[in-house]
């Protein structure tokens, strides 16, 4: 009897003399969730591209259902029931949800009614409410992820690989996804789960394999290890303090004040303040209005009413340029689209928010000063790059995020807003980014952090504001931090606020 759906034996892969994989062993069993863990650059995605038929290994064997197999392209893998859902989604933005789900069956299945009916059935199974006739390009990133999963479920799958599936999902949607994964596991599907969120990995996985520098560190049963053991395997050392000590910071006078803010449909009568040296979190479900609040404060979306004040002075923000001039910076949730110019050098990205500091009186660039400033920034942020002339696209996710942070360190404003600051970042880089965020507060900045990772909010923030349906429903402090309290406030609002936190 075959006990493994897939067995990757002694897999090696080189790209131009660089060893991406070195004799890696990995297997997938029916009815099991096998987590694949490691820092960015460890080789996880490369190994899954081998399983998905996207790349051919330099050495080693791919065994599917007990038979040695050559997977020459993704079609070979799909024919064997292997589907890989990548972090970078492969959808056609100008086609409808239904057309994307059944793209492989077009044009043979041309009835729009049939397409949409079948698509709705799949989406309903996933527990989401998405119009199958809507263009994919108009969906949120979270709902695009749902479409990608529905597309996989439309096929007769034996193995499904999830690469960072909850990176763009809030807690509620992540719970729905985990229910789906458990259902697939119960049907005998083999599941590979890649994630940097170790708490959810321990919740969903039966086994874990850790990779480092293109090699297998080890495979363990989830019940046999603790999170600290996995971190040590991943980074080669224990991370004693993932989050910095709050006691090292001095909280001063109020810097940012937002009063009765209304913007579009998603920001309704929002009021709060952030003081110098303070880190305030903004929590809630996806679609609660958190990102929209950030965009309104940054001048990216127009206000319908309300005031934004900095150091007691009301601001008139008609654009992000106005916000930057006033001293407000934003690290957006999608760093590749809005945080950096991905193909430009590190030095250009790091100085673009305050070019005036590296040009002369005539407006010409002073290259020596630019290099000096960016080199110093890179050292202070522990940026790992071959050169400050390297394009941002050549960096890992964690180092790309450091470049976005470098931009605002260089700009020197008073208020920094960070939207999902560690999305897609490995555990070692997370600890470094947390330290950098804390450094901003130590330097007297007012810091607003938006995150779908509750432990991130609780570990970093002095206070956490709970948002729901475009409103701030309440506030939590360290004495009553818990996921139950945050979700309770976000979903139920004032009815439970007296028991769980302060009303704002």
UniProtKB/Swiss-Prot annotation:
Keywords: ATP-binding, Cell inner membrane, Cell membrane, Membrane, Nucleotide-binding, Plasmid, Repeat, Sugar transport, Translocase, Transport. This is Ribose import ATP-binding protein RbsA 3. The lineage of its organism: Bacteria, Pseudomonadati, Pseudomonadota, Alphaproteobacteria, Hyphomicrobiales. It is found in: Cell inner membrane. The keyword Transport applies. Belongs to the ABC transporter superfamily. Ribose importer (TC 3.A.1.2.1) family. InterPro entries: AAA+_ATPase, ABC_carbohydrate_import_ATPase, ABC_transporter-like_ATP-bd, ABC_transporter-like_CS, P-loop_NTPase. It comes from the Bacteria. It comes from Rhizobium meliloti (strain 1021) (Ensifer meliloti).
